[in-house]
Amino acid sequence: MTQKTLLNDTHRALGAKMVDFGGWDMPIHYGSQLDEHHLVRRESGVFDVSHMTVVDLRGDQVRPFLRRLLANSVDKLKVPGKALYSCMLNPRGGVIDDLIVYYLGDDFFRMVVNASTREKDLAWLREQAAPFGVSVEQRPDLAILAVQGPQARAIVIGLARESEREALTKLGRFAALQVQSDDGVELFVARTGYTGEDGFEILLPQDAVVAFWNRLLAAGVKPAGLGARDTLRLEAGMNLYGQDMDEEISPYEAALAWTVSLDEGRDFIGRDALEAQKAAGTARQMIGLVMDEKGVLRHGQAVTTAGGQGEILSGTFSPTLAKGIAFARVPAGELGEVTVDIRGRQVPVRVVKFPFVREGQAQPGVLADA
């Protein structure tokens, strides 16, 4: 049975086109995916991401548990409220899921994981947490709104209690703060996002989410759907689980080496496999592609390099760049001239570093010919 967030009727009243997204009835757009994309890049937009999974982890051994569970190191989290992006891996080094974890106390961490992997993730977390005596509590009572764009933070701060606005203004990136709205709603506000823009992701009680959504719209934020969320995250060089990586792909093959922390000698799940892969060299690499010809790069298209064949993972037309962009996984080594098979024609593409766009601007080399 299709699941719905509490904002489902609200989305429909706003004229949203609804689609099935991993078993959830979610808005893909509210009239124009293109307009919503540009609004987030230039002003502000709000996404209902209440389908995501919030998990609270508690216990005296919660930090040792996370040191074992995650490829990135929670030892980097020294100040309460700070957040970390990481993958949790299987023993083969494949990605079970990517997630954000928040350090909220010596015996309390909060994690946000994907919606499509919920049951698998919860089962894995509980299995791994048991020897540490750590409790794993899913929080279906919390909704999540992502308010993103250059104007997003100022608008949200304006809805907070006056006494807490200064602290929210000073909140650093990848950090969270528990505050109240000016009408008394508890808000867990994190300066994180999945768009490449500044903004907040807000966890709040389900019974308050419709009213808070309406307050955001009244303050000038426009609703944005999952279509714009996908083009924004791809421009921002952010992976999508299940499309860009999965349990058969290691972080090294998914351009996520920066999320692997081997230095401090932790015995985390998947470490042995990653060390072996690092020593032998990975067979595949994930690269960014830009197409200067008109057209769209799409998932599954064949990519030819000097080293052999690969394929496009995530591809789209970039509204900000007005060009086709993509992630592709191809054989490791020299790439040479790279082409993509589009309806039987080998179309030349350029290999570029991603992100393609950062805070509304094309990154160096993305627009110019190599």
Swiss-Prot record:
What assembly does the database describe for this protein? The glycine cleavage system is composed of four proteins: P, T, L and H.
Q: Where is the chain membrane-spanning?
A: none
Q: What does this protein do?
A: The glycine cleavage system catalyzes the degradation of glycine.
The superkingdom listed in its UniProt entry is Bacteria
Q: Name one Pfam family in it.
A: GCV_T
Q: What is this protein called?
A: Aminomethyltransferase
UniProt organism field:
Stenotrophomonas maltophilia (strain K279a)
What is the catalytic activity of this protein?
N(6)-[(R)-S(8)-aminomethyldihydrolipoyl]-L-lysyl-[protein] + (6S)-5,6,7,8-tetrahydrofolate = N(6)-[(R)-dihydrolipoyl]-L-lysyl-[protein] + (6R)-5,10-methylene-5,6,7,8-tetrahydrofolate + NH4(+)
State the family it belongs to.
Belongs to the GcvT family.
Nucleotidyltransferase in keyword set: no
Q: Keywords in alphabetical order, please.
A: Aminotransferase, Transferase
| Keyword check for Repeat | no
* Molecular function GO terms recorded: aminomethyltransferase activity; transaminase activity
Q: Which gene encodes it?
A: gcvT
Q: Which GO terms describe its biological process?
A: glycine decarboxylation via glycine cleavage system
Signal peptide start and end residues: none
Q: Which GO terms describe its cellular component?
A: cytosol; glycine cleavage complex
Entry's EC annotation: 2.1.2.10
